[in-house]
Amino acid sequence: MGDYGFGVLVQSNTGNKSAFPVRFHPHLQPPHHHQNATPSPAAFINNNTAANGSSAGSAWLFPAPATHNIQDEILGSEKAKSQQQEQQDPLEKQQLSPSPGQEAGILPETEKAKSEENQGDNSSENGNGKEKIRIESPVLTGFDYQEATGLGTSTQPLTSSASSLTGFSNWSAAIAPSSSTIINEDASFFHQGGVPAASANNGALLFQNFPHHVSPGFGGSFSPQIGPLSQHHPHHPHFQHHHSQHQQQRRSPASPHPPPFTHRNAAFNQLPHLANNLNKPPSPWSSYQSPSPTPSSSWSPGGGGYGGWGGSQGRDHRRGLNGGITPLNSISPLKKNFASNHIQLQKYARPSSAFAPKSWMEDSLNRADNIFPFPDRPRTFDMHSLESSLIDIMRAENDTIKGRLNYSYPGSDSSLLINARTYGRRRGQSSLFPMEDGFLDDGRGDQPLHSGLGSPHCFSHQNGERVERYSRKVFVGGLPPDIDEDEITASFRRFGPLIVDWPHKAESKSYFPPKGYAFLLFQDESSVQALIDACIEEDGKLYLCVSSPTIKDKPVQIRPWNLSDSDFVMDGSQPLDPRKTIFVGGVPRPLRAVELAMIMDRLYGGVCYAGIDTDPELKYPKGAGRVAFSNQQSYIAAISARFVQLQHGEIDKRVEVKPYVLDDQLCDECQGARCGGKFAPFFCANVTCLQYYCEYCWAAIHSRAGREFHKPLVKEGGDRPRHISFRWN
């Protein structure tokens, strides 16, 4: 738009008018041939011209430490060059800056060329930069900064300057001023809430120490144009370290206005850890954040640099706190939305371990914030840790109250060491809710059987071999009364070779199922899956239409047995002890292991495992189950009851409970010494014994008073213990 300024006339207490200077274009300015001591910015604000004849200045602004004329503002370019060289030499020595040779080595060739091209326009900045920079409103300018010895040509330390607000008294050395060859102004940082005092040693600008753990809710994510005054005030000056003149910072046209309420984000714009990245080159990753074609731009809204507008400092500060607070979106029509920060997610892919439990506070330790400078850091914020925690919560809701469903998948038996001979083949995967099933219902609840083929928990192939998920024996109920074996076979032959069977078929010599149900024994397990796919699901049950000579398309219930329902681990952290396992006889076949575990845990507590005994060939339930407890008290309470009422849905049956007897245990009394190392044949289920005995030890122990009525249990076929009558000799 051009190099223009404006002036404001304010009424002082003395009645005189203090005319604030107007910056004119260099071609329109008259030449001057004298130079006085360059005043401070505060003095320049309160400076009175010779026309009003007063040196007091405006009483409501800052007192002028030196008298200054408006004619002293603009210098010749030749004299400014010499003063600039004289000013920078002692300043570089005081602030331990690298030598010009070293700076030339660090400076990129493109930036170095820019500095040489703009040296002519930049020649008068250090000599009278503080005059040219005062294009802002004089009302707010006094709160931006005080005189620093590194700004003007005067090298006298201004030790008398102090903060006008007593509340802000702790200041720390930060960044020395430097000229910008791009915008022809001295770039400086914001100093909100007070006027920092200048250092008497090296002229470095001082600003307040704020703790890093300031609440993230007061960050810099406020829009630059939220305030009503932001539309009426031009740019505020901002100091910049002279080392960073090699990586020139540009203001993005997308956010031309600084935040008007400077006290809101003062604590986050001057953080000590921001100054550590000044000497680091900008990252080309941030080029998407600014319309500038050069990768050195960090003044765009998305730029994570140390001086960027738009609240990126407060946003980055919140990332370190893991507060989980998303930045406020800008309401400015000129400012980009912060949603563009998520573009960085494409460059830094999330690790596959995001689903592992992860603490919010430990999340910052593994991030790239400690490696990359601000422009290079991934913009994942706290959503990564927040999303990880939400996933853990959702997964916990799908687990059981005390244990984990889907504890082990087929082929992963190593996750829980269970004796396969004693406790079953696999740990199952099933759902607790809902459990509305009946005697003719398999109780699968909300697990559609026909959709099981595509279930992520069921693997159709494993190590090149097909994994069976269903028993080859299928229950069919509700058959027409006049249907015979041949008609049943013809109705289901399209799914694969099969044999029709029902209880006592050989003895009855009947061609019709006596009670309206039968079992289909398929040759291949894939035939069962094909049958399930052809069924119609209603209320969690599967139906298929079958015709007879008198009834056409009668729906019959298809009840397959899911192999994963044979076992259920409620508490995988507890070891399974055979001495704390009970045998449950007469279990209804639709009852699943998870349902048996929940019933026993509700009655006695401490259940860690439940299993359904299945046929070793067809893997179909045999009508018995096992329950393992984690403590002796629950085990004794279960076997002392002897009978348990199993109530679940339509199931209401009284079953018998006995200790689970093993056939490979040595005698607990003699450890096989009296019986030649043979396994103990007897087990005493009385709560006073609960031990295995050989024949000799049983006779010796139970001949005592009070134990003569104990009945031993023996292991027999079908994993069922039975009572035997022990006769005394």
Swiss-Prot record:
Residues with site note (RNA-binding): 473
Residue ranges annotated for the RRM domain, each copy included: 472-563, 580-662
- Compositionally biased residues, Gly residues: 301-313
Could you say which residues bind Zn(2+) 1 here? 667, 675, 694, 697
Q: Which UniProt keywords apply?
A: Cell projection, Cytoplasm, Endoplasmic reticulum, Metal-binding, Phosphoprotein, Repeat, RNA-binding, Synapse, Zinc
Q: Which residues are annotated with the PTM Phosphoserine?
A: 97, 99, 137, 252, 255, 330, 332
InterPro entries, per database record: CEBP_ZZ (IPR032296), CEBP_ZZ_sf (IPR038446), CPEB (IPR034819), Nucleotide-bd_a/b_plait_sf (IPR012677), RBD_domain_sf (IPR035979), RRM_dom (IPR000504)
Return the protein name. Cytoplasmic polyadenylation element-binding protein 4
**What is the source species?**
Homo sapiens
Upper lineage ranks? Eukaryota, Metazoa, Chordata, Craniata, Vertebrata
Gene that encodes the chain: CPEB4
